[in-house]
Amino acid sequence: LQIPDDRPCTNPGRCPLVPDATCTYTCKAADNDYGYECQHLWTFEGQRVGCHA
């Protein structure tokens, strides 16, 4: 099983609460049909941030 490497989001849009945040598409192992799950992870200055109130 090959879990995809983290990569920049292809079409992240913007982070309303933190406009300068960086989006990373990150995947981890999971118990589903694919063997992994992926999510958009927003960070700013090394800290994970939320984009929606």
From Swiss-Prot:
Keyword Transmembrane annotated: no
Entry binding sites for Zn(2+): 53
InterPro entries: MCP_Inhibitor_Domain_sf
Molecular function via GO: metal ion binding; peptidase inhibitor activity
Biological role: Metallocarboxypeptidase inhibitor. Has an inhibitory effect on bovine carboxypeptidase CPA1 and porcine carboxypeptidase CPB1. Unable to inhibit proteases from other mechanistic classes, such as porcine pancreatic elastase, bovine pancreatic trypsin and chymotrypsin, as well as subtilisin A from Bacillus licheniformis and papain from Carica papaya. Exhibits antiplasmodial activity against Plasmodium falciparum in an in vitro culture, reducing parasitaemia mainly by inhibiting the later stages of the parasite's intraerythrocytic cycle. Does not have cytotoxic effects on human fibroblasts.
Subunit: Monomer.
Protein known as: Metallocarboxypeptidase inhibitor
